[in-house]
Amino acid sequence: MRVAVFVLSFIWLVNGELLEADQDAVVPGDWTFLGRVGPLEEVELTFALKQQNVSKMEELLKLVSDPDSHQYGKYLSLDEVAALSRPSPLTEKVVENWLRSHGVMDCHTIITRDFLQCVMTVEVAEALLPGSKFHRFSKNTKTLLRSTSQYSVHEDVHQHLDFVGGVHRFPQKRKIVSKGWEGARQAILGYHLGVTPAVIRNRYNLTAKDVGTAANNSQAVAQFLEQYYHPADLAEFMSLFGGGFTHMSTVERVVGTQGGGKAGIEASLDVEYIMSSGANISTWVFTNPGRHESQEPFLQWMLLLSNMSAVPWVHTISYGDDEDSLSEAYMNRINIEFMKAGLRGISMLFASGDSGAGCRHLTKERNTFRPSFPASSPYVTTVGGTSFQNPFKLSYEVTDYISGGGFSNVFPMPDYQVDAVRAYLKSVQSLPPQTYFNTTGRAYPDLAALSDNYWVVSNRVPIPWVSGTSASTPVVGGILSLINDQRFLKGLPALGFINPRLYKMQGKGLYDVTVGCHLSCLDDKVEGKGFCASPSWDPVTGWGTPNYPVFLASLMD
């Protein structure tokens, strides 16, 4: 039997083509090499099949997201999205025949039929994907199977696939976008009394009555790798900080496997602050540690969303990676998945990152800024960060110097933001040199919130001075959930993909942040300074931070 499989496999090996030639296959320094994986060990690979009607879906998303369109808010069901995007019969047949020819039979798909997840031995995987060589790596208690060399597929299959998941991508070195910035920041900013739900609700003008009441409303956070929240931490947090407003102290639903280890500070932060800003609203937690050593947790989360007909309306995610560490094929395909979520009326919020404009060292003499993905996707709403100008009281906000922002090197600037971004580029006198950024790329963030010096309860311990855009993102997500709540009570649809409407509002309902810059490359040309805030939109804080009553009124039609 193995001989027959080999003969069939040999036929398919002729004239292979690289599928993700630009994918960074470098092993991050914090992962330890354990050696080659045995040929009979199993891997699970995810095959992203080419979809149909991508341009049509893009046009439909513009229509359902544009408040001036007669189709505004007329979202599609998952089945309707699946009917549009499903791969062609030829694509399905070619890919399935290719897999069967290698003896790969243990496969399952999802409702949209555009992803195939298949279990096979390493021996078969390496024959299927010439050039791949799987090794085992470890970090703390986590192990992964990955190939550090480029892979190809047969030329007849190449045109039918976007990428194969589970081959190259390591989890991001920082795990997710933000970290609890203790250490040096704690020593400098230790005098701050700290941001709590009461501070958030006061600053953004949320009253005790501004809580959820609609039965059909819901919101969610996503967690990856060893990031888990503990129910006891949430209950303790609400006991300490939830006075003065009606709230829930338990998560409605956990999707995935909730680990039994120590709570992660990021996971605690996400859950505690989406549930205190979007108070009294049903909250889900998507937890994706990866069931198999070869799985990619972020990709598994995307597949879950594509396979569930009923999901929360607002999702906040504090995850990101450098654009230049990912293949364009992968990013373009994930971008389409965000587009499909928008067609369903789902709001996807991503943290902008905690590295300012970032910095990539190209040569000894040349640096550029380093945009982050998915923050740079034109089909998500990206949230930046701010600090109080006066750390002792509720004062106006300035930029948080770590707040991520900039211009994509992969995605062109979408129509909805062209006027705002061009106005910024024309009006600001102290821009960084244009060799550092792409003036025609998707610019982010879109808006912001406080991201500095939060109180969090993790492992039953109250922890101060936690900072990052993983704090601001769930706060904005909760506020959008409150607006959805009011819309549902009036018979209006969910906000969905909010960016086209947000840019048409031109900052209405948002506090404009005009003071401060964020960090970037430490060289003699920019000297650590990236972009700076300015009146109207800017690539540090977007349009600004929420003024809830005005923001709500602006979004209630």
Swiss-Prot record:
Activated by autocatalytic proteolytical processing. Gene3D superfamilies: Peptidase S8/S53 domain. Residues 17-190 form a propeptide. Binds 1 Ca(2+) ion per subunit. This is Tripeptidyl-peptidase 1. One of its GO terms (biological process) is proteolysis. The active site is at E266, D270, S470. Its cofactor is Ca(2+).
